[in-house]
Amino acid sequence: MMNENLDATGENFSPEEFDVERALRPLSFDDFAGQEQVLENLQIFVQAANLRGEALDHTLFHGPPGLGKTTLAHILANELNVGIKITSGPVLDKPGDLAGLLTNLDERDILFIDEIHRLSPIVEEYLYSAMEDYRIDIMIETGPNARTVQINLNPFTLIGATTRSGLLTAPMRARFGISSRLQYYSTELLSGIVERSSDILKVPITQDAAIEIAGRSRGTPRIANALLRRVRDFAQIKGNGKIDIEIAKFGLKALNVDAHGLDEMDNKILATIIDKFKGGPVGITTLATAVSESAETIEEVYEPFLIQQGFIYRTPRGREVTEHAYRHLGRVKGSNQGGLFDN
């Protein structure tokens, strides 16, 4: 089962967690930390669009979950002083769903589509003319009386977000004038984000505690904020309300988040590859079955960080663990030693 504190997708957040997440979200370029090159380019593009009085070019944000794609979409709306409508690829089942959103956009407004790689082919094709020519064709009536009516749209900006840019079709990718990949954050940047969030939450925190939380946050601001909120609970119940290094370590240990930021499922994936598949290679479907998790979740949530940190790597035949993974779990390569997750 996924540790919701390390769920960078945010899919397991409660309504209350979403409210807090929104409160912690930066509202302007000045508030946003990290992604310097992306931010610098966006500031130039926004200034130019504002000077010309035009809609910003269609923009694609891609990269692992929790790095700020949705936040940047809101910041762009604020910096452009325009409205924003938010939806996601799986929600748009048919062209009519998309038409209702597009026809209600004012000039220069933003339509943000999360998980844009999950758009159905028919909706994606319907979007092409809207992106290129600011027009859509709507079918009126059915049967022998059916006819097509062309509707002109106000110039708008489509912002797409995806964790799997490789699944985007070439025609869709080509229609984005701006494409920005977001990278994992350093511990230094994340500690600053933790301190900023603690100020907003009105919970005192020491610098070393902020660094401790940041170092276990998988390079992801959303996870850093989630861990901060949970450690705050431990500080209020087990401590004096202040987050110091001792309470931070205590809370993170209770949450099963180790010094590398790996949680129970991360370690289970590594241990399973070592113990059941002799270190690999093993296919993603087989691995997913072995650890009782979906292949999509492993590929989107766990695998990117494990690869980035040097615990596993992909081969044409499947996933293999590295020497780093053996050392992390205290295993000896080539031995038949059992592990923590054996039955």
UniProtKB/Swiss-Prot annotation:
GO molecular function, one term: four-way junction DNA binding
UniProt name for this protein: Holliday junction branch migration complex subunit RuvB
GO BP, one annotated term: DNA repair
InterPro entries reported in the protein's UniProt record: AAA+_ATPase, AAA_lid_4, DNA_helicase_Holl-junc_RuvB, P-loop_NTPase, RuvB-like_N, RuvB_C, WH-like_DNA-bd_sf, WH_DNA-bd_sf
EC number: 3.6.4.-
Family (UniProt): Belongs to the RuvB family.
Location of region: Head domain (RuvB-H): 259-343
Catalytic reactions on record: ATP + H2O = ADP + phosphate + H(+)
Keyword field: ATP-binding, Cytoplasm, DNA damage, DNA recombination, DNA repair, DNA-binding, Hydrolase, Nucleotide-binding
SUPFAM superfamilies per record: P-loop containing nucleoside triphosphate hydrolases (SSF52540), Winged helix' DNA-binding domain (SSF46785)
Subcellular location per the Swiss-Prot or TrEMBL entry: Cytoplasm
Species this chain originates from: Christiangramia forsetii (strain DSM 17595 / CGMCC 1.15422 / KT0803) (Gramella forsetii)
Any one Gene Ontology cellular component term annotated for this protein: Holliday junction resolvase complex
Keyword DNA-binding belongs to the record: yes
Entry binding sites for DNA: R314, R319
Job of this protein: The RuvA-RuvB-RuvC complex processes Holliday junction (HJ) DNA during genetic recombination and DNA repair, while the RuvA-RuvB complex plays an important role in the rescue of blocked DNA replication forks via replication fork reversal (RFR). RuvA specifically binds to HJ cruciform DNA, conferring on it an open structure. The RuvB hexamer acts as an ATP-dependent pump, pulling dsDNA into and through the RuvAB complex. RuvB forms 2 homohexamers on either side of HJ DNA bound by 1 or 2 RuvA tetramers; 4 subunits per hexamer contact DNA at a time.
Binding sites annotated in the UniProt record for Mg(2+): T70
Region spans: Large ATPase domain (RuvB-L): 1-185
Domain comment (free text): Has 3 domains, the large (RuvB-L) and small ATPase (RuvB-S) domains and the C-terminal head (RuvB-H) domain. The head domain binds DNA, while the ATPase domains jointly bind ATP, ADP or are empty depending on the state of the subunit in the translocation cycle. During a single DNA translocation step the structure of each domain remains the same, but their relative positions change.
Subunit structure: Homohexamer. Forms an RuvA(8)-RuvB(12)-Holliday junction (HJ) complex. HJ DNA is sandwiched between 2 RuvA tetramers; dsDNA enters through RuvA and exits via RuvB. An RuvB hexamer assembles on each DNA strand where it exits the tetramer. Each RuvB hexamer is contacted by two RuvA subunits (via domain III) on 2 adjacent RuvB subunits; this complex drives branch migration. In the full resolvosome a probable DNA-RuvA(4)-RuvB(12)-RuvC(2) complex forms which resolves the HJ.
Pfam families cross-referenced by the UniProt entry: AAA_lid_4, RuvB_C, RuvB_N
